[in-house]
From Swiss-Prot:
Pfam families, A to Z: DnaB, DnaB_C
Enzyme Commission number, as recorded: 5.6.2.3, 3.1.-.-
Domain SF4 helicase positions: 196-462, 341-604
InterPro entries named among the record's database cross-references: DNA_heli_DnaB-like_N_sf (IPR036185), DNA_helicase_DnaB (IPR007692), DNA_helicase_DnaB-like_C (IPR007694), DNA_helicase_DnaB-like_N (IPR007693), DNA_helicase_N/primase_C (IPR016136), Hint_dom_N (IPR003587), Hint_dom_sf (IPR036844), P-loop_NTPase (IPR027417)
Protein name: Replicative DNA helicase DnaB
Organism: Mycobacterium leprae (strain TN)
Domain of life: Bacteria
Protein family according to the UniProt entry: Belongs to the helicase family. DnaB subfamily.
UniProt function note: The main replicative DNA helicase, it participates in initiation and elongation during chromosome replication. Travels ahead of the DNA replisome, separating dsDNA into templates for DNA synthesis. A processive ATP-dependent 5'-3' DNA helicase it has DNA-dependent ATPase activity. The intein is an endonuclease.
Subunit structure: Homohexamer.
GO molecular function: ATP binding; ATP hydrolysis activity; DNA binding; DNA helicase activity
Length: 604
């Protein structure tokens, strides 16, 4: 039996279709011959068939080879008849394998008329769909046996569901629609926009000025929200970093090494920069005597929110430290207890030194640095869109978070909605007023149709399958993927850029298929930091130019005070609408309240 699709998945071996059921797989060889015969007779038949069939839809491998040769000739603008197709197959060394040139003439003689090629193609497509269903069922059975033998049951169920969804996805349909059939739905959309205050049926972002420009996030759109990663920034090369077995230095750590997360659990380094020279640096001394040299943009989680090195204030900013840390440089233990917070004793500008940064894979993106075990941090914008969509407007949304855990996301949502400092929530310093505000908001928050999936190492296929399933259950209106550069395909690509391009293409296809906006959180490269004007540009999108090409909307996040603590626009952030396929570009200014885990509209 021919294997039509290679549906191997990461983490679980592909299961070949079984031929042990004693039945002939669904097929119609006469219909296959009639399709190919019609294509050899008529160019119009080729155009009709290629919209309905893929090569793998043919049961006989010989028919697959003939079909591929016909399409290649047709695509090159060359005639596709018995003579030219025979020559093409001979060039590929496949002519004898399909039965030689006489078989091509047999195909022509079996078809009564080329005009019916499209009808025959429908028969072939139906049989192919049934074969895929049989093959998927065989794999599902084998997955069930794998679960009985100790494989993760949740993963087995997810793979089984994905198999069935993949079968349904293979069905082809005519996507062109006559204009007259589109006029009334378009008029209905216009009426809905007018009655909704100018906002289309898309999901509102929650930012008034941005919604005025975009009319919300529209079905079928892929929206890229990109910012510089705040994780790690840059520390001096001699900065000590605790590891599960001792200590290393920032200059020595490599991708794949393990550091310690803020809870002192091992966390793996997934990215590391080259050594950077000439960056403005600060020496920060903490209340326990720890001294760390970091570049001006290094971010620290303080009691007042995220602050860069240049923004830290002596005697005012407090940084939470690890709960229990060693006081010596030997093997790490939990014997010595450290005060739960560290005060900033001094911050002073020092001469520039070589610096470097790393990125870690734990959910909070925190790792410990220095003998005092001081954590560093990162944050994103996507949750603001979800809060507007689900909490304010009661539209279903889902976030696939490869960066933060469920608990971290919920804590940020509560912080933003109840206006409670995230640092106070994490450290147990909430006041009675904080608890009262939280209680008032809990009812509305708990009723929001907002879904969170923090499954590690999510593949694009899994995201698509889960989004489809949720769409059927909840009338899903918004998908957020956080973030793009943490996605994995489970396949081999010639470069990471090619892999990210593939993710980009599939996210756009997902938006069109489910008819909803898909927001992909992405990263910018470090180019803005090297320019006098720090504002990011489209060319700064990290790892793939395809992101810019595939996206309908690209929003670049820029905070002026992240680069200069004395910037007159302190507390402001720019949402740079750098690409807007269906409208104008614009820069929208919002207020950042990072201590409350949110951005908000500027006061008017």
């Amino acid at each position: 039996m021919a294997v039509v699709d290679d549906l191997a998945h990461s983490g679980m071996d592909a299961v070949p279709p079984s031929e042990d059921f004693g039945r002939q797989p669904p097929q119609d060889l006469a219909a296959e011959q009639s399709v190919l015969g019609g294509m050899l007779l008529s160019k119009d038949a080729i155009a009709d068939v290629l919209e309905r069939l893929r090569s793998g839809d043919f049961y006989r491998p010989a028919h697959q080879n003939v079909y591929d040769a016909i399409l290649d000739l047709y695509g090159r603008g060359e005639p596709a008849d018995a003579v030219t197709v025979a020559a093409e197959l001979d060039r590929r060394g496949l002519l004898r394998r399909i039965g030689g040139a006489p078989y091509l003439h047999t195909l022509i003689s079996t078809v009564p008329t080329a005009a019916n090629a499209g009808y025959y193609a429908g028969i072939v497509a139906e049989k192919a769909l049934l074969r895929r269903l049989v093959e998927a069922g065989t794999r599902v059975v084998q997955y069930g046996y794998a679960g009985a033998e100790g494989a993760d049951v949740a993963e087995v169920v997810d793979r089984a569901q994905a198999e069935i969804y993949d079968v349904a996805e293979c069905r082809l349909s005519e996507n062109y629609v006559p204009l007259e059939d589109l006029l009334q739905p378009t008029m209905d959309d216009l009426d809905a926009i007018a009655s909704n205050g100018g906002i289309s049926r898309g999901a509102p972002t929650g930012f008034t000025e941005l919604d005025e420009v975009t009319n919300g996030l529209h079905p079928g759109q892929m929206i890229i929200v990109a910012a510089r990663p705040g994780v790690g920034k840059a520390l001096a090369l001699d900065t000590p970093l605790p590891t599960p077995t001792g200590w290393t230095a920032m200059g020595d750590v490599a991708v794949g090494d393990e550091l310690l997360a803020v809870d002192e659990a091992p966390t793996r380094v997934v990215a590391a920069t080259e050594v950077m020279l000439g960056r403005p640096c600060y020496e920060i001394e903490f209340s326990d005597g720890t001294v760390i040299v970091a570049d001006a943009q290094h971010q620290w989680p303080t009691s007042y929110g995220i602050r860069t090195s240049a923004q830290l204030r002596c005697g005012l900013d407090i940084i939470a430290a690890a709960g229990s840390t060693p006081r010596h440089a030997g093997r790490l233990t939990t014997a010595a207890f450290m005060a739960p917070v560290l005060c900033i004793d001094s911050v002073r500008r020092v001469r520039s030194v070589p610096v470097r940064c790393v990125e870690v894979d734990n959910a909070a993106h925190l790792y410990l640095a220095g003998r005092g075990m001081v954590p560093t941090h990162n944050s994103t914008l996507g949750l603001d869109f979800m809060r507007s969509c689900s909490i304010k407007h009661r539209l279903a949304s889902v976030i696939f978070s490869l960066e933060m855990s469920k608990s971290e996301i919920v804590m940020r949502l509560l912080s933003a909605e109840a206006k409670i400092k995230l640092a106070d929530m994490r450290s147990g310093r909430m006041t009675d007023d904080d608890w009262t505000r939280l209680a008032r908001r809990m009812s509305e928050i708990s009723e929001a149709p907002l879904y969170i999936d923090d499954s590690p190492n999510l593949t694009m296929m899994e995201i698509r399958a889960k989004a489809r399933r949720l769409r059927q259950k909840t009338n899903l209106k918004l998908v957020v993927v956080d973030y793009l550069q943490l996605m994995t395909s489970g396949k081999r690509f010639e470069s990471r850029q090619v892999e990210v391009s593939e993710f980009s293409r599939h996210l756009k296809l997902l938006a069109k298929e489910l008819e909803l906006p898909v927001v992909a959180i992405s990263q910018l490269n470090r180019s803005p930091e090297q320019r006098t004007d720090k504002k990011p540009m489209l060319s700064d999108l990290r790892e793939s130019g395809s992101l810019e090409q595939d996206a309908d909307v690209v929003i670049l996040l820029h905070r002026p005070d992240a680069f200069d603590r004395d910037d007159p626009r302190g507390g402001e952030a720019d949402l740079i609408l750098a690409k807007h396929r269906n409208g104008p570009t614009k820069t929208v200014t919002v207020a950042h309240q990072l201590h409350l885990s949110r951005f908000t509209n500027m006061a008017r």
